[in-house]
């Protein structure tokens, strides 16, 4: 590998802004902010969604009623489309 062309791979704290959940992982992300966690200073990357706040992982997801939407569409436009094609 060539020297000086690879990004710095280091430990970084990712903070979920919606739930204030923080976790440490390794990344090459460039950040300007720093945070102290467990007595050690790390670069800080702020994110909007993590497994702590995403509806799929928290069990708070909504199920869309697509069958009702399709039936509503067919009731409104179904007969018009069939007549126009003839």
Curated annotation (Swiss-Prot):
GO cellular component, one term: ribonucleoprotein complex
UniProt entry tagged with the keyword Ribosomal protein: yes
SUPFAM superfamilies recorded: L28p-like
Keyword annotations from UniProtKB, A to Z: Ribonucleoprotein, Ribosomal protein
Gene Ontology MF annotations: structural constituent of ribosome
PROSITE patterns: RIBOSOMAL_L31 (PS01143)
GO BP: translation
Pfam families from the UniProt entry: Ribosomal_L31
Annotated Gene3D superfamilies: Ribosomal protein L31
Assembly information from the UniProt record: Part of the 50S ribosomal subunit.
The name this protein goes by in its record: Large ribosomal subunit protein bL31B
Organism field: Ralstonia pickettii (strain 12J)
Encoding gene (name): rpmE2
């Amino acid at each position: 590998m060539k020297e000086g062309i690879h990004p710095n791979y280091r430990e970084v704290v990712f903070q979920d802004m919606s739930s204030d959940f923080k976790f440490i992982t390794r990344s090459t992300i460039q950040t300007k902010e720093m945070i102290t966690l467990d007595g050690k200073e790390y670069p800080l990357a702020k994110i909007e969604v993590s497994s702590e706040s995403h509806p799929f992982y928290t069990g708070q997801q909504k199920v869309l009623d697509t069958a009702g939407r399709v039936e509503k569409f067919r009731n409104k436009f179904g007969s018009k489309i069939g007549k126009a094609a003839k």
